[in-house]
Amino acid sequence: MLKRRRCILFPILGSLVLFMGAVDPTVNSLRAKEARAATELALARPGEILFVRAERRRRLAGLPAATREKLCRAPVRKWRSTKAVTTIRATPGYGGDNRTERFALTVMQAGAAAFGAGDRKARRAVVRLIARWAKGRAMTKLEDPEDASSYYVVERTLLPTIVTYWLTVRGDTRIKASTRARIERWLEGLVRRSRETRIDLTSDEVSARNNHAYLAAGVVMAWGALTGDLGMVETAVAVYRRAIAEMRPDGSFPLETMRGARALWYQRHAVASLTVIAEMAAVQGIDLYGYRVGKRDLHRAVAFLLDGIEDPKRVWRYAKANVNPGPIRDYRRQDLGFLRRRAHGRHYMAWAEIYMARFPERAESRRLAALLAESQPDFRPMVDEYSGGNTSCFFYTPPGAAGNRAESGQRE
């Protein structure tokens, strides 16, 4: 697996047990079981990713026009193109190369506008933009092939690009076959690189077991669902199940909650990627929302996050490890900036739209809705790379309306 940038390496391998406790023997015993279970998977709807397009179009058509426009049409007067970023730079310190962010935002906004609002200009713009990046072999080179954060930048850009490609390009015969083929080769190459370099279920390295692995698995899951590649889906499912197995019984993720002032920030990060994987699996008839190891499941992770936001002291005993905490050194000052839309247009709670649509009757969903409204009354639309794009356009369901509720995995 990849090494983290030297300047932010954790002093972790020798003292990980201080933060996590001994490795849960459940994890090792699950590996053989998961290998057997993988052979039982099948894809119910290959070609679909986050939702069934025809069903979502019908639901959007049933919304008032003003609501649909607000959710899906972006406040953009003129869509601008951006030059392909062929080489991802290894940036010093905390974070990563941000030169792909403008591309990603355009892809997310224009993709939703094209799909949900029928915006032809947005569709033309995003098709041209994705084609330009494919032709420019964007993100295919890494300045430092050992830098985990560089792969992370690629994957957070890649997920919404795959989703928008699915919604606007793939299968559209109005687009030249050669253009579609070039885009598909470009995307597939990036996905396969992530699978080969970022996912190792036998590794104990941090980036193989934390939010990095979950994001990579989301990318692999999306491509596997789209192309009908069962092997890729099996890989993503295995990463999800390992994450649940390594969760603490209280719902916290050890490698996220040890992150000092950003303990809840990274708990939310993990929940976001796992929710996306579970939703893509549900579309394919695979129940990951209901997957449990003892009392551990995704719902418990969501509940821990909500409890920690309500009373940050609940995470202090883990956060005090203060491992790679970011700009704030005091672990007692939990960074809750993810509760509001960021200055660059993203809302890091966009995953909640997926969860609330899937489980409208759960207490966690009601708490999420109240929390988001309290933090920022006009919080929709929510757009974020880690959730695949504009989840409000893709998932919002009015209160009381029939949504995507799944009975599996619900706990009263």
Question: Predicted segment positions?
Answer:
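Alpha-solenoid repeat scaffolds
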Residues: T140, L230, E246-D250, L288, ...
